[in-house]
Amino acid sequence: MNIFADFDARIKKTLQDIDLKPKDGGELDLSRIGVEPPRDASHGDIATNAAMVLSKAVGQNPRELAARIAEALKADEDVESVDVAGPGFINLRLKASYWQRELLVMLNEGTDFGRSRLGAGKKVNVEYVSANPTGPMHVGHCRGAVVGDVLANLLKFAGYDVVKEYYINDAGAQIDVLARSVMLRYREALGESIGEIPAGLYPGDYLVRVGQELAGEFGTKLLEMPEAEALAIVKDRTIDAMMAMIRADLDALNVHHDVFYSERKLHVDHARAIRNAINDLTLKGHVYKGKLPPPKGQLPEDWEDREQTLFRSTEVGDDIDRPLMKSDGSFTYFAGDVAYFKDKYDRGFNEMIYVLGADHGGYVKRLEAVARAVSDGKAKLTVLLCQLVKLFRNGEPVRMSKRAGEFITLRDVVDEVGRDPVRFMMLYRKNDAPLDFDFAKVTEQSKDNPVFYVQYASARCHSVFRQAADQLGLVDLDRVAMGSHFEKLTDESEIALVRKLAEYPRLIESAAIHQEPHRLAFYLYDLASSFHSQWNRGAENPDLRFIKVNDPDLSLARLGLVQVVSDVLTSGLTIIGADAPTEMR
């Protein structure tokens, strides 16, 4: 249960009980009332701004109104004390019995604790990675892959119907270049000396194997075909090979998409999907024939000093109108974006989330304009931009040459440090802030390495369970037994740990609402820190050890507390896509 939602309802009920009314009549607007943890834990367990947001409507001084509300809240059987602070904040401290009951709820819910129905009935498409199928994934793709994947997992846990999607850019000019590059490697595999790879083609050695496979399958037959026919075959085989490589790279990172959507699908049957999308916009009055003035600075590739078919995107929030069709009748790349969004909308998605690199910042307004025009403002579109990742080794920048083939791949990073450190650390900054990734730092065993610190907390929980088996003979811990004596958990440090656990449902919902999966990584680190602190208190004070052989009931209660810590760590790490280890190796 979300205790903050619980007390939000209690506080609003209290406002009704004291017959709080607007001075001008009517009903009070309670929508701005906030109920959250105090910024300073010493101030209490629950804080609300109710008096400050209602004082003007009620016509009463905020502190005086706060005192009136506070007095009424003291009647709540779960409230230990109520204080008014600052300009009119109300801080509530709850009784230990309340936290003990809440801990039992958490224990009974297990790893489902924190699961929400926030997104019930809402269908969301999360598109992420969508790297061009022209080679292996490099480290630059890594952050967007993790942010998108964890956000999708988070939304699912919060009750949304989520589809993870990858858009395969397999219809552009770069694919023609790729096919010609592989054709060269095919000829090389047949024994021809190809010399240096010509400028403009892809030089990477990863294409050698594709050429060899073509030579093994076709022999010299491709050389005997008309070039266009041979290149069409090479293109299909190469895209399949590149996507197999990309899928393998993503699998190594524990990233799995539900849908791989081919751009070429939009171009089949004389680009029917694109034509239909443009026709729909035309019927809505969003398309016209005209000429665009030359933009300042570098000219975009879709600008022409001729009449074109244009999207009236400035009327739906964009900076300039956008070309859909060139003067020669060919479609712009942007026209494909319109058709792709329409396809998503027609599949029934209420919300579309695009996770893109920071270099795609210029796409945001045009995509938002497409969403408004295609859906008549009914669909929500969000673009999350991921800033660059800078690689370091022992504090020194890792140099990457731009020369042929000399770049660090996603697989290089995962193979060196492991999947879990990569996923966790890619979340340890908000997506729109640059991130430093130090190969040495993410593998060290210290508090300064967040992923180690969190996973070590999980392993320590299971260490306590093994001690219970050795010292108390409790091989199979029973949740009913562990929850039968929570009234024995009275030490302030134990209650503080329960408070931290109780924040989890609110954290899940707020991270989902704001689409900020990094909040989960921060919370898990804080929870791990609280648990490690409690472990250390037991090392210093025998009375606070999790297992007291001479007090089995207290031991069971503390084991129940440890079990809930383990459950929440497991739940959070699962959403992140990392393991919750039972021991550190």
UniProtKB/Swiss-Prot annotation:
Q: Which GO terms describe its molecular function?
A: arginine-tRNA ligase activity; ATP binding
**Enzyme class at the top of the EC tree:** ligase
Q: Does the keyword Protein biosynthesis apply?
A: yes
The cellular location(s) given in this protein's UniProt record come to: Cytoplasm
- State the source organism's domain of life: Bacteria
Query: What processes in GO biological process is this protein linked to?
Result: arginyl-tRNA aminoacylation
Family indicated by similarity: Belongs to the class-I aminoacyl-tRNA synthetase family.
In its UniProt entry, what is this protein called? Arginine--tRNA ligase
Q: Which organism is it from?
A: Brucella melitensis biotype 2 (strain ATCC 23457)
Query: What lineage does the source organism belong to?
Result: Bacteria, Pseudomonadati, Pseudomonadota, Alphaproteobacteria, Hyphomicrobiales
